[in-house]
From Swiss-Prot:
SUPFAM superfamilies: Ribosomal protein L4. Belongs to the universal ribosomal protein uL4 family. It comes from Psychromonas ingrahamii (strain DSM 17664 / CCUG 51855 / 37). This is Large ribosomal subunit protein uL4. GO terms for molecular function: rRNA binding; structural constituent of ribosome. The keyword Ribosomal protein applies. One of its GO terms (biological process) is translation. One of the primary rRNA binding proteins, this protein initially binds near the 5'-end of the 23S rRNA. It is important during the early stages of 50S assembly. It makes multiple contacts with different domains of the 23S rRNA in the assembled 50S subunit and ribosome. Residues 43-71 are annotated as: Disordered. It comes from the Bacteria. The lineage of its organism: Bacteria, Pseudomonadati, Pseudomonadota, Gammaproteobacteria, Alteromonadales. The keyword Endoplasmic reticulum does not apply. InterPro entries: Ribosomal_uL4, Ribosomal_uL4-like, Ribosomal_uL4_dom_sf.
Length: 201
């Protein structure tokens, strides 16, 4: 299959298995959820009765005071005591094998092509790290909410995009399923398309 280049009167030959496969919604959902889960910090913690300091001595004797029996001031029913079912640091990451990950990325790329959300250009860069220059270039292409993918990370482009709302710049190594679906359009260079194909085969 062919992808038409936006800035040239030509087309780029690409693999049908990478850019023309059927959309697998269940797989994409599973991989995106797993990817988002892996980004969770999971470092919250509370203290149980065994973690709270103090409470070694029995507050009063077992019998004869008229008060309810008590063995420690760190009991969960006491103010300043431990928490009954305390939160513990946990790892939320889910296992996603390479075949599933690649399948999900191919599925997303194919759907972007079908929805005319993938824009391929021969090259895309700015001469200086100036936000206004990049803004003008994106206006020419009528792009506002866009992920720009280049073969290698272009520092000028990266710096120029830092202060633009809903504009992100990634190299091929930096793309992931979440970023591909987070933007309205995906602008990718021809060299990056070839590199993406190589990485997914």
């Amino acid at each position: 299959m062919e992808l038409v280049l936006k800035d040239a009167q030509s087309a780029l030959e690409v693999s049908e298995t990478t850019f023309g496969r059927e959309f697998n919604e269940a797989l994409v959902h599973q991989v995106v959820v797993a990817y988002a889960a892996g980004a969770r910090q999971g470092t919250r913690a509370q203290k149980t009765r065994s973690d709270v300091s103090g409470g070694g001595k029995k507050p009063w004797r077992q019998k004869g005071t008229g008060r309810a029996r008590s063995g420690t001031i760190r009991s969960p029913i006491w103010v300043g005591g431990g928490v009954t079912f305390a939160a513990r640091p946990q790892d939320h990451s889910q296992k996603v094998n390479k075949k599933m990950y690649r399948g999900a990325v191919k599925s997303i790329l194919s759907e972007l092509v079908r929805q005319d959300r993938l824009i391929v250009v021969e090259k895309f860069s700015v001469e200086a790290p100036k936000t206004q220059e990049l803004k003008a270039k994106l206006k020419e292409l009528d792009l506002k909410d866009v992920l720009i993918i280049t073969e290698e990370l272009d520092e000028n482009l990266f710096l120029a995009a830092r202060n633009l709302y809903k504009v992100d710049v990634r190299d091929v190594q930096g793309i992931d399923p979440v970023s591909l679906i987070a933007f309205d359009k995906v602008l990718v260079t021809a060299a990056a398309v070839k590199k993406i194909e190589e990485s997914l085969t």
